[in-house]
């Protein structure tokens, strides 16, 4: 029992948060042997298939978004820069995260070793954080353009570029510390993908403070930004709809934008809510046992965002969708369907003047 309590200090590159009736826990290293003691082979194969789907679908839809934006000039608006940034970060996670997890789940252990774990953990964290902060920037930019809190402020190319650079800076601020000694990257969940150490406490890695830093800096702040900006946007649109009660198009825009905002906020919570809740629970319940299969879910939901975020922010955007249909299937969609009635970035035409 004494040896088990020292385990977090003895192993620099992994942690086994379950009790094993063995004298040599290193023999169960997730870098050396299949983790059959953590779950049935069917669980690993199912996760492998899921990661393969995320890799293929995530790569395809995000590459399509980038290529489509390059091909069609009308998509290269300042407000769409951040959507391309989101697609790049999603593609980053698909290539460096989902593909690695697919093979690791297939082998049932992290075959790429401790160094590979640090690389995969870092790259996945960077991609995830860029995606997270990009969603906050999307909300902020739409608030600035539609609600016009700065009066006659004009959103220009430098602002759009700054909005794309900001998420990468924030991501580096979140992803670099575990490489520098504040927390660490280790296998998580079923030990087939890597991320920050949520599990261990009271050690030299100071994981508790890092988890709280991530919760505040990378969840609470972006989420508060999203809720505030979209809340203000909805208020603005309701006022515009009330002022133009006889306009069917304005009423339709308000309804569709409201649905879009609900979907956006819900999508953010699905992606990052479980991670935030799980991390806080682990820190608040030090030493409490938990099912590693359940601990895999937050990571999977974050990787799955590479597919459902483009669906929310790109495919539900009629202008993007019409261009994609034309590029892939050579099929034209009627111009009125490609209008921006459901597109938050272009509903400023119904916003009241200030």
Curated annotation (Swiss-Prot):
Topological region Cytoplasmic: 69-80, 141-159, 238-259, 317-354
Residues carrying a glycan: 24, 207
Residues spanning the signal sequence: none
Transmembrane helix listed as a keyword: yes
Membrane topology: Multi-pass membrane protein
GO CC, alphabetical: photoreceptor outer segment; plasma membrane
Tissue expression: Retinal long single cone outer segments.
Keyword Nuclease: no
GO terms (BP aspect): cellular response to light stimulus; detection of visible light; G protein-coupled receptor signaling pathway; phototaxis; phototransduction; visual perception
GO molecular function: blue light photoreceptor activity; G protein-coupled photoreceptor activity
SS bond list: 117-194
Alphabetized UniProt keyword annotations: Chromophore, Disulfide bond, G-protein coupled receptor, Glycoprotein, Membrane, Phosphoprotein, Photoreceptor protein, Receptor, Retinal protein, Sensory transduction, Transducer, Transmembrane, Transmembrane helix, Vision
Pfam families xref list: 7tm_1
InterPro entries (UniProt xref): GPCR_opsins, GPCR_Rhodpsn, GPCR_Rhodpsn_7TM, Opsin, Opsin_blue, Retinal_BS
Transmembrane stretches, start-end: 44-68, 81-106, 121-140, 160-183, 210-237, 260-283, 292-316
UniProt PTM: Phosphorylated on some or all of the serine and threonine residues present in the C-terminal region.
N6-(retinylidene)lysine modification, residue list: 303
Cellular localisation: Membrane
Main localisation: membrane
Family: Belongs to the G-protein coupled receptor 1 family. Opsin subfamily.
Protein purpose: Visual pigments are the light-absorbing molecules that mediate vision. They consist of an apoprotein, opsin, covalently linked to cis-retinal.
Protein name: Opsin-1, short-wave-sensitive 2
């Amino acid at each position: 029992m004494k040896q088990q309590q020292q385990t977090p200090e003895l192993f620099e590159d992994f942690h086994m948060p379950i009790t094993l009736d063995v004298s040599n826990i290193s023999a169960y290293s997730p870098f050396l042997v299949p983790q059959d003691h953590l779950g049935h082979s069917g669980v690993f194969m199912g996760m492998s298939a899921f990661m393969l789907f995320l890799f293929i679908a995530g790569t395809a839809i995000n590459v399509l978004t980038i290529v489509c934006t390059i091909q069609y000039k009308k998509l290269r608006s300042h407000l769409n820069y951040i959507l391309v940034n989101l697609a790049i970060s999603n593609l980053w996670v698909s290539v460096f995260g989902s593909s690695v997890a697919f093979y690791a789940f297939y082998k049932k252990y992290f075959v790429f070793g401790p160094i590979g774990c640090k690389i995969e953990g870092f790259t996945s964290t960077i991609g995830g954080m860029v995606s997270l902060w990009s969603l906050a920037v999307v909300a902020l930019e739409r608030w600035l353009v539609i609600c016009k809190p700065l009066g006659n402020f004009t959103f220009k190319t430098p602002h759009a570029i700054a909005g794309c650079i900001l998420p990468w800076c924030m991501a580096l601020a979140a992803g670099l510390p575990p490489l520098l000694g504040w927390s660490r990257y280790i296998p998580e969940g079923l030990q087939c993908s890597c991320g920050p150490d949520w599990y261990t406490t009271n050690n030299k890695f100071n994981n508790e403070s890092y988890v709280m830093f991530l919760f505040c800096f990378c969840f609470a702040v972006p989420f508060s930004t999203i809720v505030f900006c979209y809340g203000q946007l909805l208020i603005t649109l309701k006022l515009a709809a009330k002022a133009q009660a006889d306009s069917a198009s304005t009423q339709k825009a308000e309804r569709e934008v409201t649905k879009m905002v609900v979907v956006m906020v819900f999508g953010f919570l699905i992606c990052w809510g479980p991670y935030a809740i799980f991390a806080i629970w682990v820190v608040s319940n030090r030493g409490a046992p938990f099912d590693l299969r359940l601990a895999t879910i937050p990571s999977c939901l974050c990787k799955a965002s590479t597919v459902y975020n483009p669906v929310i922010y790109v495919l539900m955007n009629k202008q993007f969708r019409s261009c994609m249909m034309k590029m892939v299937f050579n099929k034209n969609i009627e111009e009125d369907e490609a209008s921006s009635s459901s597109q938050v970035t272009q509903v400023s035409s119904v916003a009241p003047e200030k």
